[in-house]
Amino acid sequence: MTLTAQDLVAEAKQRIQEIDVAAAQQRLSSALLLDVREPAEFAAGHLPGAINIPRGLLEFKIDSHPDFQGRRDVDIVVYCQTGGRSALATRVLNQLGYTQAVSMAGGFKAWADAGLAVD
């Protein structure tokens, strides 16, 4: 059976914890924010304090990033533009041992649409 990108996202969402914008906002004081969008998307606007590691490089860069080294139990809120890439990224992070990683449903778009602060 051949899967589509949407199938992969749906499967990932069944295996991860997904939180809404309000819950993500409540975690800001204690969680790391991980933006898995491309650098140009990040430069155009991102959540304050977010760390940018694009989805395509995540598996290769996460363990060497100073904010994540030796911190597999840290709370991580992962987001992308609308929630698909962040679901896939969160699934991978969980598989890599980052068990407290969660995906923000709706992504950057939902955050901005809620009128919340962006850099």
Task: Identify the function of each model-found stretch.
Residues M1-L32, P39-V77, G84-D119:
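Rhodanese-like catalytic fold shared by cysteine-dependent sulfurtransferases
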